[in-house]
């Protein structure tokens, strides 16, 4: 915890700006993704109705409070989609030498923001705080540290594997062209699943979108309520923040904007905010008596180097750096 009021205020402003605004943008991508999933499943209602329905559903689920059973169902849908891409990745038989070369970091011309979006959707900033809040309730401070590390490694590994299989499948399937809707995504796995591809992708997108449409406001509410701990104010801050995030995301997704573009912009925003959140976590780790200062110093050095190099790349992409 942070006792000094000035430091707590400064960190609160950073969190409100970075995660509040960032999650509001990300929520529009969540709702847009779920709407794309419904479109793939055959729901042809015109905008803004799909987004409004999903936003209302997310708000009701947050109001009900008991989300454990729903989360398990939606996570199962997302896992099924990930499994579908894993099978498709094996079935399209990618050239292993090409896949190995792809493990070497290389950003093609005009591909920086796509790379940032990929990072932003794989390592979502608010998930770091949501995991911390969940870990505090589930694990004891010191006794279960090794189990916590194993859980983190496994969960991050599964997420990374999912991203890799999707990228490899899309690259090796031979289906080119821009992605503008769920049907374009489904074509990536049509060589394996045929006409069932649209339903597999539709269910996966809907599950992933609705899951995140609930957890993103929850995470923002948890984080901001930590600034006003104790009693009813905490509950009021949590519910008010979560409702506001859902409302903003729904209004943005309900416009006639390109949903794929909305999702991409939201992921880029997450990728840009990630260094700020990482720096905050390094600072909190530095204050912890349970973590080696030498270990934190090394992490701080890595963070600083990545921040400088990342800032340079972004400025070059914007034409502000020679």
Residue positions per predicted region:
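Transmembrane alpha-helical segments of multi-pass small-molecule transport proteins
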Residues: 13-16, 41-63, 80-85, 232-251, ...
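Helix-loop-helix module between adjacent transmembrane segments
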Residues: 9-30, 38-65, 120, 207-214
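Membrane-water interface regions at transmembrane-helix termini and the short interhelical loops
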Residues: 32-40, 55-76, 253-262, 285-289
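Loop-to-transmembrane helix boundary motifs in multi-pass membrane proteins
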Residues: 9-10, 47-53, 154, 158, ...
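Extracellular/periplasmic helix-exit of transmembrane alpha-helices
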Residues: 135-136, 157-184
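Hydrophobic alpha-helical segments and their helix-loop junctions in multi-pass secondary transporters
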Residues: 78-104, 115-132, 280-289, 310-321
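Transmembrane-helix boundary/entry motifs in multi-pass membrane transporters
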Residues: 1-21, 40-47, 150-153, 187-198, ...
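Membrane-interface loop-to-helix entry segments
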Residues: 53, 62-92, 107, 269-274, ...
């Amino acid at each position: 915890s942070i006792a000094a009021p000035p430091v707590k205020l400064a960190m609160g402003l950073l969190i409100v700006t970075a995660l509040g605004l960032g999650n509001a943008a990300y929520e529009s991508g969540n709702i847009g993704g779920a709407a794309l999933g419904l479109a793939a499943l055959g729901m042809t209602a015109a905008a803004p109705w799909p987004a409004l329905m999903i936003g209302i559903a997310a708000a009701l689920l947050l109001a009900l409070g008991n989300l454990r059973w729903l989360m398990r169902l939606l996570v199962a849908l997302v896992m099924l989609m990930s499994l579908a891409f894993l099978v498709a990745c094996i079935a399209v038989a990618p050239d292993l030498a090409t896949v190995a070369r792809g493990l070497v970091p290389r950003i093609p011309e005009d591909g920086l923001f796509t790379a940032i979006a990929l990072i932003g959707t794989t390592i979502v900033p608010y998930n770091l705080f949501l995991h911390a809040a969940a870990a505090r309730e589930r694990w004891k401070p010191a006794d279960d540290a090794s189990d916590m590390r194993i859980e983190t490694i496994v969960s991050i590994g599964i997420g990374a594997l999912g991203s890799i299989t999707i990228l490899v499948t899309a690259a090796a399937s031979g289906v080119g062209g821009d992605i503008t809707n769920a049907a374009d995504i489904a074509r990536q796995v049509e060589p394996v699943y045929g006409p069932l591809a649209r339903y597999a992708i539709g269910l996966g997108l809907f599950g992933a979108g609705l899951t995140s449409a609930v957890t993103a406001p929850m995470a923002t509410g948890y984080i901001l309520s930590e600034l006003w701990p104790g009693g009813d104010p905490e509950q009021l801050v949590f519910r008010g923040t979560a409702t506001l995030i859902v409302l903003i995301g729904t209004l943005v997704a309900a416009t006639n904007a390109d949903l794929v573009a909305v999702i991409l912009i939201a992921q880029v925003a997450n990728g840009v905010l990630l260094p700020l959140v990482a720096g905050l976590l390094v600072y909190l780790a530095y204050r912890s008596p349970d973590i080696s200062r030498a270990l934190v110093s090394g992490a701080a050095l890595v963070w600083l180097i990545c921040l400088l190099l990342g800032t340079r790349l972004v400025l070059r992409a914007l034409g502000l750096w020679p």
